[in-house]
Every structure is written in C-alpha cells, then in structure tokens.
Amino acid sequence: MGNCESRELVAQAKQNKIINTELDKAKKTDENIIKLLLLGAGESGKSTVLKQMKIIHNSGFSQEEISNKRNVVCANTVQAMGALLDGMKQLQFDFSTRVCNAHEKLIRETLNDKAEYGPFSDAMFNALTELWADKGVQCAYDKREFFYLHDSAKYFFDAIARVHTPNYVPTENDILHTRVPTMGVIEVNFTIKGKFFRVFDVGGQRSQRKKWIHCFDDAKAMIYVASLSEYDQVLLEDNTTNRMHESIQLFKQVINNKYFVNTSVILFLNKIDLFEEKIVTKKRSLGIAFESFSGPSQDLNAAVAFVEKKYRSMAENKEKNIYCHHTCATDTQQVQYVLDAVLDTILSTKLKGCGLY
C-alpha cells in the first residue's frame, strides 16, 4: 500500500542531497538569484502552492510525473476512506447496509498491505463507491471536524468512477489535491524579468522543522502558508493540539528568528474556501479556537480579520512588513493572480531597502 508514496519519499531524499550540495556551493551575493523559502505547518497547503508555481511558471508536470501520480491518487483515496472509517468508529456510527462490513475489511487489509499499490480493482471500486454512499459513512463525514481527515477526501471520493476508468490519467487538478508529506527539501526554479527564482519547500511536520533555519538565512523572502480552515482541527502528530494554534506559534518562531531579520514576509492565509464553508454554511464559529473572538460568529470577513491580526501580532518588531493574501491554493487562476502580485512585490524597487535584492 505504501510503496507508491515511499518511492516519492526516496526521490525527495535524493533530491534533497542534490539541493543541499548546490546550496553550499551557491554564491549568496549573486544579485540575479532570488531565493524564496516556502514555510508552513503540515497540511497548510504550501506544497500545493509549490505545485502551482510549477504549473504557472515552470511548464507544469512531465509525463513521468503525471503517470507516477496515478498510484498516489489511488492511495490517497483509500487512505482517506480508512481515516473516515476510523472516525465513524470513534463516533460510534453504524453502516446502513450489511455489505459495507465486507467493504471495510477490504479497505483495512489494503491499508495494512505494504505491497505496490496500483489502480483500483473492481472489488476496491465497489467497496469505495458503496462505502461513500452509505448513510452511516456520510454521517461520519458530516462530523469530520472531530477526527483527522484530509481536506481532499471528498474530492477523491467524488472522482472514484473517473479514476477507475482504464485510461485514467491524472489531471493537474488531481495532482494539486494529492498529498504526500514533504520530507526534506523540494525545489522549483523559474525566471521572471531577468531574475532567477529558487523556491524551496521544506517539511512541515514537527520532525522536519529543525532543518529549516540554518540552510536558508540568505533567503530574500519567505512565504508562510497557513490554513484558515484548521481552527477546529487537531494535529496529525498528536491528535490533541489545535492546528491553528500550532501554526501561529510556528509563525512566531520563524518571523522572530535572528536569521530572518532582513527577510520580507509574505503570509498566505490559505483554504479560504473551506473556511467560508465552516463559518458561514456549517455555522462553526471561530470562537471554538479563540475565546476572545467576539464575532459576529457567521461573518467571514470578521473571522478572517481576526486570524490575520493574530498572525501579525506574533512579530516582535512591530514595524516589520507582513504582506498578507487570502488564498485557495487549489484554484490555479486565483493563485496565479496572487503569485503575480507577490513576485512583482519582491521585484519592486520599493522593497530594495528591505533586503530583497
């Protein structure tokens, strides 16, 4: 089950060695190279932002990359169903049809199998389809804030039939929704207006964070990606810590670190679409995470402004510029607009005095 993802992790490790060697050799004074650091807690969407940069500025994904993602799509779908079934058990919901007990057994066996995971078998297709249609599973999904479930779960469940077709090829949107934890460093390069950008995405899980700081003290700008929608969720690593609280504390550590005193900070408050759904449609007030939030509880603008203020307040230097954007990282058109504005900001002469270049 895990080999298709472990291959990606091995590839990441090899790439990480290459990048570290190049970093050691790079001339920090080269004015035509702009190094950008992409930071954020796990599952904030920063790797999705990097994929968007690859699509928008670096001619997208190769045929080999697209082909390799098919297994990742399948693995993510089965993993999401496994997590949903765990949540269902936690909430003590029952299946509405008996056949789903056999389907659950297949999901569990597949998740425990460490062999290569390929396209859905007919049995797996039937299991996923009928489980997703089950009323008990749907009830658990509606209560997903009480257990860990990846944001892209519904996207992949709704795509089960399409993914099961013999000639299925992952779309860019499919790839944007895939999830493989970033281990080490991933780099994307592109040139704009005569400047060579090197963008580095580093691991967001706790175990990866200590590797960030010393390697990137010469970064010209930092893009910190924070998920707005995680205010009612807990960390995958410990299942107790509020994810937004964790992200805010991480932002505090990074923005006040001595290595980044002269680094401009760009804050992406990401997943605003999911945030709006929770605040407006599901009526889950931000007060769940912050007792000081006075509302109005269903006011999206008030909630976003509160979170933005929380992040900004973490800077010890109150004069430090923090350029904030509200984003949906899976929306290529919107991300392109935001990235164009960000890169123009980085290149503008107005910010030369801030140590950009």
UniProtKB/Swiss-Prot annotation:
Its cofactor is Mg(2+). Residues 174-182 are annotated as: G2 motif. GO terms for molecular function: G protein-coupled receptor binding; G-protein beta/gamma-subunit complex binding; GTP binding; GTPase activity; metal ion binding. Residues 32-357 form the G-alpha domain. Residues 35-48 are annotated as: G1 motif. GO terms for biological process: adenylate cyclase-modulating G protein-coupled receptor signaling pathway. Mg(2+) binds at S47, T182. Residues 266-273 are annotated as: G4 motif. Residues 327-332 are annotated as: G5 motif. A lipid is attached at G2 (N-myristoyl glycine). GTP binds at E43, S44, G45, K46, S47, T48, D151, L176, T182, G204, N270, K271, D273, A329. InterPro entries: Gprotein_alpha_su, GproteinA_insert, P-loop_NTPase. Guanine nucleotide-binding proteins (G proteins) are involved as modulators or transducers in various transmembrane signaling systems. Belongs to the G-alpha family. G proteins are composed of 3 units; alpha, beta and gamma. The alpha chain contains the guanine nucleotide binding site. This is Guanine nucleotide-binding protein alpha-1 subunit. It comes from Caenorhabditis elegans.
